[in-house]
Every structure is written in structure tokens, then in C-alpha cells.
Amino acid sequence: AGELGLAIMTQLAPAPSTQPNRAPVGAVDAPRTYEVRTYGCQMNVHDSERLSGSLEAAGYIRAERGQADVVVINTCAIREKAEDKMLSALGRYRTQKVSRGAVIGVGGCVAQQEKDKLLKKVPYVDFVFGPDNISRLPSIMERVEQDRVRVVETAWMDSEEYVFPRADPETSRGKVTEFVTVMKGCDNVCSFCVVPHTRGREVSRAFPEVLLEVADLAKVGVREV
């Protein structure tokens, strides 16, 4: 498996035609907007909800497709078709980068698998981050926008410091279904499977904690987890 994680910073030097013209984070004019595109499995759908929540907590506002200042593509490496769709989507978002100065990031399993190679393969991508680094997205954005660097964050969190995301009962109110995470990763390194390499080592959540989260969701009307 080799090295488990990577965190590097490289100088941002896109071609002149794609050089972004963007305001720094925290600018007092119009709020920054974002768009999250999801490819792959249900876990990615859940991760994209976390991505959106992380950006909104940092002051970003969801935008219509093609109108965002920040585009995050959440990827899947299990299914080849999902990876092909991601690469095709990146080509379409290049126009948005030229016309709006959009910041483009790639997260998820392809990001974890490719790491800095993705920056070389797609030179107009500004940042790459793995599944363990979703909570760090606002700080990644600051580095990209303020320091004008391209960023790769794919280091694994230690199992002792990993905190499982909890669904917020208030944002879940009125939903029929909701995701509850019980574990992540896998310790079985099978020759045909990339999960240990893209999702990390197995970390399980305490059973009482899972029951408590399900009970809190049931109180606000969720009926399926």
C-alpha cells in the first residue's frame, strides 16, 4: 500500500487564459457561491451533504449549475463509469473557470487515489482532497484563494482522532430518510478492491452512539436510516 497519505502545496500557475480573477475569502461584497457535483455511491451522496454543510458554515451559498464561484466534484473510484463522468465534467467546468474565475476542486476516492497526479493530469484543478479531509475544506479554500496555491490534502486521520459526522436533527427535520454512518474504511486488502486505499483503515463507531443518533433523527420525523 505504501504511503498512506500526502499533504503538499504547490505554486498555482495555470495558463494565462485560465488564470482566475477572484476576490479573497471574506470579501465584503457579494457572498461566495458554491456547487457540489456527486458521482458514485450512496456514501458519496452522504459525503456531499457534509461538503455542502462545511461550505455553508464558512459562509458560502449554494448556486445554480454553472453560476458558482467554487465547484467541488465528489468522485468515485470503484466504478469506472463514475470516474469517466468526472473527467468529462471537469472539461465542462473549464469554461466556467475562464468566464467566472471559478475555483475547481476534486474530492472523494479518485482524489485520494490520484493525489498530486490529478493536478498534473488536469492543470486547471485548484485543489484535491480525500474523504478524511472534508472538515478541512474551508481551510483548504483559504489557502487556494488567499495564497494562490494549488493544494493536495489526502492525509489519513488517526483512528483515535477521527470523529464520525453526525446528522443535524434540525436540518434533517421533515426528511423521510437520512444517512447514519456506522463505520468507514476496511482492513481487508483484497486484490480486486480499492476501498482500503481510498477510504483508509477500518474505524467503527460505538454502538450506543449510533443508537442515540437514530433516536434523535426519529424525534424529528425521520423514518428510514
Annotate each PLM feature.
Residues 1-225:
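Proteins enriched for Cys/Gly/acidic motifs involved in redox and nucleic-acid/cofactor modification
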